Structure formats: C-alpha cells, structure tokens
C-alpha cells in the first residue's frame, strides 16, 4: 500500500509503501500516446530552463482547450523559477527575469493547470518532453499523477513528411505556410500546433 511520496538525493521521485520499502516512480500512470482524436482536447506547450526535468524548471505553460474545433478556453501563465534564468533562455524564448518576478510559483501553477486540463487528451509538438516536466512537477508539488493520453504532432510529422530537412516545429509550420513568428513562447507554439 502506498504511504507517501518523496524525492531522492538525485531528484527522482519515489514512493514509500506501508512496509517502509522505497519504490522508484517511473512515471507510473502516465497516459498513452494515441492516434484517435476526440471532439474535446487540449493543446499544450511549455517553456523551460533546460532539457532535464530533474534539474530544470518550467517558466511558462500555455494550454488551449478545443471542442469540435473551437477554442473554448485558454490557460496561460509564466512561472517563477527558483533561480534567475540565463541569457540563452531569454534569447530563445523572449522571457526575461523581470517578466518572471511577479509570476506565480510552480506549486500554485500546477494545481491550476491540472484543474484546467482535466482528463482531456493532450496534443502538442514534441509533447512527450512537456508531459515529462508536467508529470514530475505535478507529482512533486501536488502528489498528483498526470495520466492523460496524448498525441505528439512531431511523431506524426516525421511519418507524413519524411523528406523535410528536419522536423522542428518551425520547419513543419513553414512547410504548411504557417508563419512561426513568436515561436518559443508557449501560447504561440500552441497556436502553431
């Protein structure tokens, strides 16, 4: 029986069972990658301070809820990191430390995001990256499991556009005549997706 959740010395989540044993959490309950498309879904994107959810932080989350092809709600917020972001992240995203000063912290943001997305199918570009950050932060901050199924648009693009020079979101958007101006801001990336 599950008793508590903790973080080990390497920053990885674990659970403690009733007999005192520690079990590593390997994103148990994480949703599946699917192909079927329901009428209601949420497109999401995050911006982070780096690539590894064990050491890097979320600095922006945007999610757009659709029903029958119409946007019926948007969740978008900057997230205050525990340390200032570096110049490279600012140059990539356009997000500055000044912009993050008054942003909510990750714990508050995770609960609001969880409430917004509910049980919707999640859609995004390279969304497995986003899901891993969100899964770990929901578990660490709120002891919640993100079990939503998801569709990764990048995986689809790789299958249907094998001849592209790469499968970055901007390259695929350009292929379809979509201007990726403002890319690497979460809300814009959601709209491109």
Where are these regions (language model features)?
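A short, structured active-site edge motif that brings together acidic residues
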Residues: 147-157
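Conserved non-catalytic scaffold segment of RNase H-like nuclease domains
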Residues: 5, 10-148, 162-184
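Acidic, divalent-metal-coordinating active-site segment for phosphoryl/phosphodiester hydrolysis
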Residues: 185-193
